[in-house]
From Swiss-Prot:
Protein function: Part of the Sec protein translocase complex. Interacts with the SecYEG preprotein conducting channel. SecDF uses the proton motive force (PMF) to complete protein translocation after the ATP-dependent function of SecA.
Keyword Transport: yes
Organism, as annotated: Rickettsia canadensis (strain McKiel)
GO terms of biological process kind: intracellular protein transmembrane transport; protein targeting; protein transport by the Sec complex
Listed transmembrane segments: 20-42, 140-160, 164-184, 194-214, 246-266, 272-292
Binding partners and assembly: Forms a complex with SecD. Part of the essential Sec protein translocation apparatus which comprises SecA, SecYEG and auxiliary proteins SecDF-YajC and YidC.
Single annotated GO MF: protein-transporting ATPase activity
Designated name of the protein: Protein translocase subunit SecF
One Pfam family it belongs to: SecD_SecF_C
Family membership noted in the UniProt record: Belongs to the SecD/SecF family. SecF subfamily.
Subcellular location: Cell inner membrane
Record keywords, A-Z: Cell inner membrane, Cell membrane, Membrane, Protein transport, Translocation, Transmembrane, Transmembrane helix, Transport
Keyword presence, Cell membrane: yes
């Protein structure tokens, strides 16, 4: 039985991506500036992982009246109390930020007493977590180091596999994706916690993977069509990998959409940020990391070097 590969686009497509190079650069610069301004104005909504505080997970015997609960707990005078559903409508997450260890137990008991005195529900407390401010700072440092090491490892890999200018193209695309993702986080007020660090690392990996696929095809076509100029080769390479790129992004977005719809509040920030990052990474691999190679076109590509490179 013969198996036919799934194709979303015709085998031969000749869309002139390079013709939109200046437009895409301008668009990306504008988006990056908006993201930087948003970060400066709105900051980040740091979660308890980073700023410290209390998390209480509780299951109720019926659907709670969240607006009334927020009002009652907000009147306790212990700071901003955040209530969210996760999993089901009867599962509740209660978060109180910036609590010190000195009044930790007092605040927990105060919240429990207020719930029992004001609501006729049966409460099943499933988890009570506390993260101190010192631990939060350590987690921020660890998350930052994880991102820096991932950048470094990616640059070394690209430099070994391709050439330094390919690595520079991917670095610029990654910085673009990172700035847009951080700006999106600040504008949408997504929780900035350990799961969002994982989301950023996922976005970096996805963006690099997309760019490497196109770069690999560019290197192959440089060997095959050494008489063509670099602009024609980049256009050809993007078009040849376009069906694969679109199919990959659709299947990945659908899988991630399931996490957004059914994963619950606990992984909402992760899922939404990855969804946005996949779109940004796909865009940057086509319209930034590949076209930016034309900046080095005047420094003639040494095709013999590519022929010998494995």
């Amino acid at each position: 039985m013969q198996i036919y590969p799934l194709r979303l686009l015709p085998n031969k497509i000749d869309f002139d991506f390079m013709n939109f190079k200046k437009v895409s650069y301008t668009f990306s610069i504008i988006l990056s500036l908006i993201s930087v301004i948003s970060i400066g104005i709105y900051k980040f909504n740091f979660g308890i992982d980073f700023v410290g505080g209390i998390v209480i997970e509780v299951r109720l015997d019926q659907t709670p009246d969240l607006p009334k609960m927020r009002q009652i707990l907000g009147e306790l005078g212990i700071g901003e109390v955040v209530l969210q559903n996760f999993g089901s409508e009867r599962d509740l997450s209660i978060r109180l930020g910036s609590s010190s260890e000195a009044n930790l137990m007092e605040n927990i008991e105060l919240i429990k007493a207020s719930l029992h005195n004001n609501f006729p529900y049966k409460f099943e407390y499933r988890k009570v977590d506390f993260v101190g401010p010192q631990v939060g700072r350590q987690l921020i440092e660890a998350g930052t180091m994880a991102m820096l090491f991932s950048f470094l490892a990616i640059m070394v890999y690209i430099w070994v596999r391709f050439e330094w200018y390919f690595g520079l193209g991917i670095l610029i695309a990654l910085m673009h994706d990172l700035i847009l993702a951080l700006g999106f986080m600040s504008m949408t007020k997504l929780d900035c916690n350990l799961s969002t660090i994982a989301a950023v690392l996922t976005i970096i990996g996805y963006s690099v993977n997309d760019s490497v696929v196109i770069y690999d095809r560019i290197r192959e076509n440089l060997r095959k069509y050494y008489k063509k100029n670099i602009t024609e080769i980049i256009n050809l390479s993007i078009n040849e990998t376009l069906s694969r790129t679109i199919l990959t992004v659709i299947t990945t977005l659908l899988a991630n959409l399931a996490l957004i719809l059914f994963g619950g509040e606990a992984i909402r920030s992760f899922s939404v940020l990855v969804f946005f990052g996949i779109i940004a990474g796909t865009y940057s691999s086509i319209f930034i990391s590949a076209p930016i190679l034309t900046m080095f076109a005047n420094k003639k590509f040494n095709n013999k070097k590519f022929n010998n490179k494995r």
